[in-house]
């Protein structure tokens, strides 16, 4: 089981990223806190971390073929808030994807966002 802080650290340990919070409004009633991990070189979004209804999510960019393959895995869906052809969202603590698979997808997302 990962916490938000552990997931942020995992992403930073395995991808050249920095965290930003561009979608969070201080005067909003929005309860979802978005942690956007941007590639250090390109400043493009590499990963997004958020929680909704006590579920921790990680959004990553993959090739379209890899997206089609991974959405067959429990706990992985097309990212509703991104281009669904290229992005997936993983329910981190409720997926059948292994840590190694998630790290592989993170590496792919980092490569695609350079």
Residue spans of the language-model regions?
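Charge-dense, helix-prone N-terminal extensions
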Residues: 1-114
């Amino acid at each position: 089981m990962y916490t938000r802080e552990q997931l942020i650290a995992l992403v930073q340990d395995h991808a050249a990223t920095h965290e930003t919070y561009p979608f969070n409004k201080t005067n909003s009633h929005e309860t979802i806190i978005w942690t956007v991990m941007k590639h250090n070189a390109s400043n493009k979004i590499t990963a997004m971390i958020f929680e909704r209804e006590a579920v921790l999510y990680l959004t990553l960019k993959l090739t379209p073929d890899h997206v089609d393959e991974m959405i067959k895995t429990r706990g992985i869906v097309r990212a509703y808030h991104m281009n669904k052809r290229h992005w997936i969202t993983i329910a981190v603590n409720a997926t059948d994807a292994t840590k190694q698979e998630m790290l592989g997808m993170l590496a792919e997302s980092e490569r695609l966002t350079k």
